[in-house]
A protein has these predicted regions:
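Hydrophobic alpha-helical segments, chiefly the membrane-spanning helices
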Residues: 203-204, 209-213
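Feature 926 captures the class I aminoacyl-tRNA synthetase adenylation module centered on the KMSKS loop
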Residues: 1-197, 201, 205
């Protein structure tokens, strides 16, 4: 199987964009001997990959058969994991070597014998989409605030909510709104800059959620 960028889902393109941005940051930090900053960039990417991409892609990973969408999800994750191993190799040599042997050498015995013989990952600028990264960051912020609002109101996530207002001076596309609605178990998310008494009373009487970006 091969990674075919033009056939990837938005979540796949987001992860690859974040991956290339991470490689760019880590490479720059290592060149300037900024080791803690390089490690932090790697950690943040792994957190995003584990806590967001993998969780949002579970249905694709476990889908029956080997449809193209499932292959795309697997290949995107595989590419990200191998890239992380290569980028982190100077800092955590033994762990990344084990990852490389399990992910690469077991599949391709003709591959280089060690991760430490591999070149540092090259940045693919064409895969970096700043707008996509920014929009997904807004989704993540909204989800975090929505969960906090639920906790404050003592409303568990399994209990559906009719409406959530997001205080913001802009709106996200329907694709991202649907992700928020799914993550927070909300029937309708509305972006608004209106903080009128009408919305306040609705919040108090119907236990609506209000978040602010």
């Amino acid at each position: 199987y091969a990674l075919e960028y033009d056939r990837l889902a938005v979540m796949d393109k987001w992860l690859l964009s974040k991956m290339n941005s991470m490689v760019k940051t880590v490479d720059s930090n290592l060149d300037n001997y900024m080791i803690p900053e390089a490690a932090r960039a790697l950690q943040e990417f792994v957190d995003d990959m584990s806590n967001w991409y993998v969780r949002r892609s579970r249905d694709r990973f476990w889908a029956k058969g080997m449809e193209q969408d499932k292959i795309n999800a697997y290949m995107t994750l595989y590419t990200a994991l191998v890239t992380v191993a290569k980028a982190a190799a100077p800092m955590i040599p033994f762990m990344t070597e084990q990852i490389y042997q399990n992910l690469v050498r077991k599949i391709d015995p003709a591959a280089l014998e060690s991760v430490h013989l591999c070149d540092f990952p090259e940045v693919n600028e064409s895969w970096i989409d700043a707008k996509l990264e920014s929009d997904m960051d807004e989704v993540l912020k909204t989800v975090v605030m929505g969960r906090a609002a639920r906790n404050t109101a003592n409303i568990k996530n399994r209990q559906p909510i009719a409406q959530m207002y997001v205080k913001a001076d802009h709106e996200l596309s329907r694709f991202y709104v649907e992700i928020i609605e799914d993550e927070l178990n909300v029937k309708q998310v509305t972006f608004t800059d209106d903080r009128s008494e009408e919305h306040t009373s609705e919040l108090q009487s119907l236990a609506y959620l209000v978040c602010r970006l």
